[in-house]
């Protein structure tokens, strides 16, 4: 028996179900699309730590499938587990979201060591290693979304023998999901241009591999596992585990592929009413207040910003502590207003911002506590923190809160309520500036399981805050783009793409970012008076002599592909230069209806740092 779900073809025979085709990819081989390794069970392989030939993969027998308009659910069973894989598609594209639930149907407890969300088996014969290319995206501070393209043969997957240990494997370990790479990639047949984009929707550890089996290539997608991320999961009889979700999109060439991926992401992205019209945002942080805002400074900056047509004015880190900005971080965590910086209270300043016709925003780092924040260290019990071997994890003078603990939920919920109802926040920027590493072994079989459970609890809390305060716009940031994954982006409507401080370098990020995030989600800094040049002097004379019209215009253009985060010493600019920014805001506003439906078009393809051109106006059709 064969049947089709969207662009996927399945075949049921001999008590097994196989995926036999996907758009542009006539699959070869006879391998399962679900792999599950149980501790103590035989892994039918001598191939090192490759994820195929798991103890349960080929033992899974077809039980049933339920095909509805947008959803396909396939149930398979071995003697030990039931695997329920769910595929979800939408009518306006070919993207598909996939996840698997594993249930222990054995009489005794089992320990899962590896569970795929999905395996695309046989996407090309090994003989095509030279013409199939993988594009992955490296990440780092100030250099997000950088593509690297290699053929599978260049990556070492050669057509030599069928029992090879070689694999191409990429992943993340820790709470910054995208600190080294995006959890996505593009597979392309260079001859036909048939292409596939895959993404793993995990806000913490994740893993994928490409290797060979039975004379063909496979793509394994999932979260952490025992070998990568120190993850295992104990299931008692009747208990279940849900994998991360993954998504696939198909296309012919880069632009068609990204268009289909963009349409799919619009169905899974976070949305909220106050962000529906993609309002422009000014944030004091970049090239301005940094981590030392004050009521007096805001009264200087805000009147100028309000004249430009900006909708939100955000006060970033520093509104909440008495310590100086350069030493503030070891002391953060109570999230109460600074009497030194805001002697009349933060509410007096946010009310002033609203009196100018803008909405007000505040910053918070809700997942950490400074290691010198005595008040909160006394309030929280030891089991409120992520820990290993009974010791709290500490990075850069910060401890990490565990959102599985009700005391953490209670205090942080009150902190958000205080920011909204007492301090007048219409916008909350939620930052996360450190990585906790492999995870926590408190109340978990392994650190990877503890990290995953905490991360899911944190996102559930985010959903609760959005439900409690639907009038508030919540932004996610992680030292720029260090957590730019679609587990996170399915809970937030806007994400910071980078902390890049140079407007001359930002185009290399902005030029690629729509391959990773929606244009209506991807926030890009625009700092017309931003400069890393030594000798910067914050006076009108210096600024107007040294900040050119071209610099202002380029800063505005940098942000047009995504969401504008305006910043810097605008109050020092001449009326002529301010009018250039106002024109830029008006043009940004004019693009909003189009942007909400637009798909990427990359006339020169993906770009790299140092390219002479990111895009060419003459190439646009």
How would you describe each model-predicted region?
Residues 1-212, 229:
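Polysaccharide-binding surfaces and accessory modules of carbohydrate-active proteins
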Residues 64, 233-252:
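Short Pro-Gly-centered flexible turn/kink motifs
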Residues 100, 321, 338, 351-355, ...:
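Active-site and adjacent substrate-binding regions of carbohydrate-active enzymes
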Residues 181-185, 190-194, 606-621:
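Carbohydrate-binding surface patches
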Residues 217-227:
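Short, structured beta-strand/loop micro-motifs enriched in basic residues and often containing a Trp
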Residues 375-410, 455-571:
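Glycan-recognition surfaces
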Residues 567-619:
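Glycan-recognition and catalytic regions of carbohydrate-active enzymes
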